[in-house]
Structure formats: structure tokens, C-alpha cells
């Protein structure tokens, strides 16, 4: 069994597709098909076998999943999370990060005072957006760039941004 700390979420099954047990897979890799090059596991560390059938215009993958052969079986997989072992991932270049490593990091202001946490990282096609949950429980979306986040470490990020009062 693998600890979730040793796993990186690389995809999730969105829905079933067709009557033959195919599933629609949302891959978090870039490009989306890179997920197929990894040894994939579930939360318990059991191997997952995925075979690509096709890819739609949104980049979602239509796949076979393990031995699922019918739509009824595939319907139960909605929301199923797919992981790979952290150790199997390539080394990152400077200023590259895995989403899993940034999510929940403390956000500090320029005076190194904690003002919130990274709640989520989103991408709608025009670049990464950081969702910050501030200490007062409000959230804001900010572009993920050096102007807003000049310092990023494995333990915290510094935010260069003045919130409106």
C-alpha cells in the first residue's frame, strides 16, 4: 500500500462513454496522453490498466479501463481518481512545480506573515490560476506568475498583492 504522499493525482474518470464500458478520462498531464506512459495506480496502490480509444476536442481521453466491459460497470467509476508514483515522475526544471506540491501551501505576504493557503490551481486554457483562501475565509483567483508570486518554496509562497479593503 502506498501513502497518498507518495502518489500524484494524474487523472480522474469523468463519466462513462458509449455502451462498451469505455470511460471519459480527464488527464492532468501535459499533453493529456502522457498519462498513458505512466504506471498508474489507485489510492491503494493497485495497478490500473488503461488503453486509449480516442481523444476528444477538449483533450479528454476515451479509454478502456481495467476489465470493464459494460456501460453499467463503467457508470460506477465516475469520480475515480488515478495516480502515479511520485518517484516515477521526471525531475523538474527550476520554477516548475507539481500541482500536488503547491496545493495547501501557506501563502505569506511580503512581511512573511501567513495570510492564507493555496486552495486550488485551475487552468481554463490561458494559463494557471491560483485560488487562494485567505485567513478570513474569502477566496480570490490570481494569475500564477512571478509578478504575483515572486518567491515559491516547497514550504510556502510569497504573495505580492494588496487586497482591497
UniProtKB/Swiss-Prot annotation:
GO biological process terms, semicolon-separated: ribosomal small subunit biogenesis; rRNA processing
Statement: the UniProt record of this protein carries the keyword Chaperone: yes
Coiled coil segments of this chain: none
Protein name as catalogued: Ribosome maturation factor RimM
InterPro entries: PRC-brl_dom (IPR027275), PRC_barrel-like_sf (IPR011033), RimM (IPR011961), RimM_N (IPR002676), RimM_N_sf (IPR036976), Transl_B-barrel_sf (IPR009000)
GO cellular component, one term: ribosome
Quaternary structure and partners: Binds ribosomal protein uS19.
Gene it is expressed from: rimM
Keywords tagged on the record: Chaperone, Cytoplasm, Ribosome biogenesis, rRNA processing
NCBIfam families for this protein: 16S_RimM
UniProt lineage: Bacteria, Pseudomonadati, Pseudomonadota, Alphaproteobacteria, Rickettsiales
One example GO MF annotation: ribosome binding
Function description: An accessory protein needed during the final step in the assembly of 30S ribosomal subunit, possibly for assembly of the head region. Essential for efficient processing of 16S rRNA. May be needed both before and after RbfA during the maturation of 16S rRNA. It has affinity for free ribosomal 30S subunits but not for 70S ribosomes.
Subcellular location: Cytoplasm
PRC barrel domain segment(s): 94-165
Family as reported in the entry's similarity comment: Belongs to the RimM family.
Domain remark text: The PRC barrel domain binds ribosomal protein uS19.
Amino acid at each position: 500500500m502506498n501513502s497518498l504522499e507518495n502518489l500524484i493525482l494524474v487523472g480522474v474518470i469523468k463519466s462513462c462513454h458509449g455502451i462498451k464500458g469505455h470511460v471519459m478520462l480527464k488527464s492532468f498531464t501535459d499533453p493529456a496522453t502522457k498519462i498513458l506512459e505512466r504506471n498508474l495506480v489507485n489510492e491503494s496502490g493497485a495497478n490500473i490498466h488503461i488503453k486509449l480509444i480516442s481523444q476528444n476536442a477538449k483533450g479528454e481521453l476515451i479509454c478502456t479501463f481495467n476489465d470493464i466491459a459494460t456501460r453499467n460497470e463503467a457508470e460506477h467509476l465516475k469520480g475515480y481518481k488515478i495516480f502515479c508514483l511520485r518517484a516515477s515522475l521526471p525531475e523538474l526544471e527550476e520554477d516548475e512545480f507539481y500541482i500536488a506540491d503547491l496545493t495547501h501551501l501557506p501563502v505569506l505576504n511580503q512581511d512573511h506573515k501567513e495570510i492564507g493557503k493555496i486552495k486550488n490551481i485551475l487552468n481554463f486554457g490561458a494559463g494557471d490560476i491560483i485560488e487562494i483562501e485567505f485567513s478570513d475565509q474569502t477566496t480570490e483567483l490570481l494569475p500564477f506568475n512571478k509578478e504575483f508570486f515572486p518567491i515559491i518554496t516547497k514550504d510556502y509562497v510569497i504573495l505580492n498583492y494588496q487586497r482591497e479593503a
